[in-house]
């Protein structure tokens, strides 16, 4: 099944689809991988971790698919801690270096999704290692928000967190959410 995840993400779909809010794409993920996501959230895909590509597939399921399956819902972020821990372990053992540059950035996305300033310091280094100015630019945009607010204000509504006046004003500006 890990091969199907990687094929779906990297071969059958494009970056334009990865980053767009597309109900049809979200439904394709729900139909093909909804049950798999539930298993991943329970830690049941641990056998995938024997290979770098398997680790990557598990991280994509937890980090990326969660956002597509549960838009505007707290469950979109419920697996972030697990995805980050898996990504940190993958980086620690060098699994991120065993895949192509295009795929490698998905080992780093859980760092970008973190609401920790310390984690974003590491993320800048990781994304900088890709020799991909666009990926680094997006990480830096995320980091600016975390440095300023200590969290992503655009998640507040989904997570039932109160927004400060400064966050409300910020959310009215361009590029305030992703």
What are these regions (language model features)?
Residues 1-56, 61-178:
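Intrinsically disordered, low-complexity activation-like regions
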């Amino acid at each position: 099944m890990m091969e199907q995840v990687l094929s779906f993400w990297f071969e059958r779909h494009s970056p334009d689809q990865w980053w767009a809010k597309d109900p049809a794409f979200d439904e394709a993920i729900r139909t093909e991988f909804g049950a798999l996501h539930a298993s991943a959230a329970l830690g049941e895909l641990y056998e995938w971790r024997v290979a770098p590509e398997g680790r990557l597939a598990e991280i994509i399921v937890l980090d990326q698919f969660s956002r597509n399956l549960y838009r505007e819902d707290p469950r979109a972020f419920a697996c972030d801690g697990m995805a980050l821990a898996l990504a940190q372990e993958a980086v620690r053992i060098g699994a991120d270096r065993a895949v192509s540059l295009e795929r490698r950035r998905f080992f780093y996305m859980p760092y970008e999704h973190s609401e920790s300033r310390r984690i974003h310091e590491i993320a800048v280094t990781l994304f900088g290692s890709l020799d991909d100015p666009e990926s680094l630019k997006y990480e830096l945009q995320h980091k600016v928000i975390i440095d300023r607010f200590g969290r992503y204000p655009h998640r507040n509504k989904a997570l039932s967190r109160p927004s400060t006046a400064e966050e409300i004003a910020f959310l009215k500006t361009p590029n305030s959410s992703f």
